[in-house]
Amino acid sequence: MEGSDFLLAGVLFLFAAVAAVPLASRLGIGAVLGYLLAGIAIGPWGLGFISDVDEILHFSELGVVFLMFIIGLELNPSKLWQLRRSIFGVGAAQVLLSAALLAGLLMLTDFAWQAAVVGGIGLAMSSTAMALQLMRDKGMNRSESGQLGFSVLLFQDLAVIPALALVPLLAGSADEHFDWMKIGMKVLAFVGMLIGGRYLLRPVFRFIAASGVREVFTAATLLLVLGSALFMDALGLSMALGTFIAGVLLAESEYRHELETAIDPFKGLLLGLFFISVGMSLNLGVLYTHLLWVVIAVVVLVAVKILVLYLLARLYGVRSSERMQFAGVLSQGGEFAFVLFSTASSQRLFQGDQMALLLVTVTLSMMTTPLLMKLVDKWLSRQFNGPEEEDEKPWVNDDKPQVIVVGFGRFGQVIGRLLMANKMRITVLERDISAVNLMRKYGYKVYYGDATQVDLLRSAGAEAAESIVITCNEPEDTMKLVEICQQHFPHLHILARARGRVEAHELLQAGVTQFSRETFSSALELGRKTLVTLGMHPHQAQRAQLHFRRLDMRMLRELIPMHADTVQISRAREARRELEEIFQREMQQERRQLDGWDEFE
């Protein structure tokens, strides 16, 4: 592509995303399907604005690379070790069983057995980008099904290497003997990357962070991600696997959150580009010519994978309420099929339209997943949001809640228990299906689903409730829910959980004054106890805690106008100095009044 062509393609991609994704969200079909439809519209079989799909598809794989780096940051090595059984047990079983069944079905058609084996392996893989995105959207990350789904995807990435090595063997074009020297050099290079990353990455980032220039830190992060991807690609390994390992090596470092913040905007844009390019690759000519066969192939592919995944989830002991989520989110074909089938085609394993039919099947199966997950959500909603069983008697028999609690993790549970202990009528909205049944048994009125859906809020009694307590894990969900409540349920008193100062600023800007920073109060209480153990009078330590809380809140409010502004950095330093001066001055005054409590403070 020429430089001007790349610029034009970039403008078209941005326009397609800006136009299609909000429309898709408004129609309720999700952003991923919106990207895919946008790709079809601007691709060679749509309006024809872009014709060089293969080059863009290869570049857009960087979205998956960035996503795997962020996933790696969230998993430390000890956590990864805990997942070893699900990775090499369920993951291996899924690939082998799905590949065997699908290859057998392909052999019943016109596929030679070699082409059927390659086709079965390629179709057995799932889309890492789509599955992880949907798992995040559905709140499956921390659930049992989400952890198992990630394990399966990780094994599939590991299986890329032997799958690609198998193609020349099946084609009969492999060398009579392996180049063991070449293989040994690749293994040594991979081990060198692990050792070098383990001992060099943290000192390097410490040196870069000391410069205080944020742009350099972002550039270093991009260099790490792209460099590790390029290195693994040169070794003939998965680029996504390389960046995942780099993320794991930095998961326990002090720069984890800063790295995630630096990468996140690039990840989102490149993932969108990936889905658009997948949509562009859909060959509508093959679809029109072989419509019936393609529809049958998509249905069979999704059905076989759901069957295998559901049975494995049952054998693994996954709760019945989570099995369909696990099976549905991994039921599509994946991006690896494009690479494997292209390699097989270059070795002349496929005949006629076989490769085109397989690729169309994979692409359409990816488009079915968001719709399938919506059907699963509706089924789960009917299953768990229906009338409660007679033996599950709630503490309060009033259908109109006083309070709606959104999210019932560790933070929300404390609030819920306090309210229930004081005979308040509460309704809980929770996206983790595994927790819904358990909470109902203990008398909570629980609705499964996404609280950012207005219909679910109405069903939960938002129009009659007095307050809503938002304890979402994701700040984006919190702010979206605040906006919805202010627009549709303005009578509600909004109380929210803030993960830190940034979220606190956003809540204040949105007009939410009743919020709690999740670690602030507990840290202050522990600090007060520390002062007492150091010899400070208990009254003086209590007053010190109150002063610090008041002054910190004042500083928080003063910094609102400069939120997300570079000036905030210098102002924050100035505010800290001011806080210290005021704190010392007021504490000197307190030392003269060690007796008595100021009830008006």
Swiss-Prot record:
Swiss-Prot/TrEMBL keywords: Antiport, Cell inner membrane, Cell membrane, Ion transport, Membrane, Potassium, Potassium transport, Transmembrane, Transmembrane helix, Transport
Transmembrane domains' residue ranges: 4-24, 29-49, 55-75, 87-107, 115-135, 152-172, 177-197, 207-227, 230-250, 268-288, 291-311, 324-344, 356-376
GO molecular function: glutathione-regulated potassium exporter activity
Domain RCK N-terminal: 400-519
Keyword Lipoprotein attributed: no
Pfam family, one: Na_H_Exchanger
Keyword Transmembrane among record annotations: yes
Subcellular location: Cell inner membrane
Family label: Belongs to the monovalent cation:proton antiporter 2 (CPA2) transporter (TC 2.A.37) family. KefB subfamily.
UniProt name for this protein: Glutathione-regulated potassium-efflux system protein KefB
Annotated source species: Escherichia coli O17:K52:H18 (strain UMN026 / ExPEC)
Gene: kefB
